[in-house]
Amino acid sequence: MVVVGLGNPGPRYAFTRHNVGFLFLDFLKSKDWKTEKYFAWSRIKLAGNDVALVKPLTYMNLSGLAMPHVLKFFNASPDDIIVVYDDVSLKLGRIRIRKKGSDGGHNGMKSIIQALGTQEIKRIRVGIGDKPEGMDLVDFVLGEFSDEEWIILNKVFEVMKEALEVILIEGTEKAMSIYNSLEVRV
C-alpha cells in the first residue's frame, strides 16, 4: 500500500488546513524521510504490512505530476494507492473513505485523477470544517488550525490510523462501514 498525503511543500504551508494530508503522514512517521525529484517518502509497518508514505513535492494543484514517478518507484498501480486530503465540505472531526469517485472540486485530487487516467483511486477525505462566512476559501484552507482544532485533529489522526489498519486487514468496504459515520469530538 502507498499512502499519498496531499499538501504544499515548504514551511509557509506546513501547518495549514490544506496540508492535512502531509500532517497525517507526519503523525504516522515524523522522521527519516527520503527525497526523490517529485516526492518525499518513508516506510512504516502497519497491521503487519509494509506501507509506503508519500508526499508529492509539487504544489497541491499539481499533485498528479508526481504520481507516475511514485507508481514506478514503488512498482505500484493506482489500486495500491490511498490518497489523503482535506475537504471543506466535511465538518472537522469527520472523515470519508471512498473506493473511487470524482475529484469533488479538490484540485489536488483532480490532478491525480487526470494523471492516472482513472477515478478508481481509494481516498480518505479529512474534514477541515466550513469556512467562516465572508472569508475567502483560499484564505481559509491556507490558514492554520487553532489549538482547539488541533486537539480534534490529533484524535482524527488516531482514527485514520485505525481505518488504514482495517483497510489493510478487512478491506475498504469494511473501513467505510465503520468510519464514515463516526464523528470525533473533544
UniProtKB/Swiss-Prot annotation:
Marked site positions, Stabilizes the basic form of H active site to accept a proton: 86
Main location group: cytoplasm
UniProt keyword list: Cytoplasm, Hydrolase, RNA-binding, tRNA-binding
CDD domains: PTH
Top-level taxon of origin: Bacteria
Subcellular location field: Cytoplasm
EC class (word): hydrolase
Pfam families tied to this protein: Pept_tRNA_hydro
Gene Ontology terms describing biological process: protein quality control for misfolded or incompletely synthesized proteins; rescue of stalled ribosome
Example of a GO cellular component annotation carried by this entry: cytoplasm
Recorded catalytic activity of this chain's protein: an N-acyl-L-alpha-aminoacyl-tRNA + H2O = an N-acyl-L-amino acid + a tRNA + H(+)
Role according to the record: Hydrolyzes ribosome-free peptidyl-tRNAs (with 1 or more amino acids incorporated), which drop off the ribosome during protein synthesis, or as a result of ribosome stalling. Catalyzes the release of premature peptidyl moieties from peptidyl-tRNA molecules trapped in stalled 50S ribosomal subunits, and thus maintains levels of free tRNAs and 50S ribosomes.
Subunit record text: Monomer.
Family: Belongs to the PTH family.
PANTHER family xrefs: PEPTIDYL-TRNA HYDROLASE (PTHR17224:SF1)
Protein name: Peptidyl-tRNA hydrolase
Lineage, uppermost ranks: Bacteria, Thermotogati, Thermotogota, Thermotogae, Thermotogales
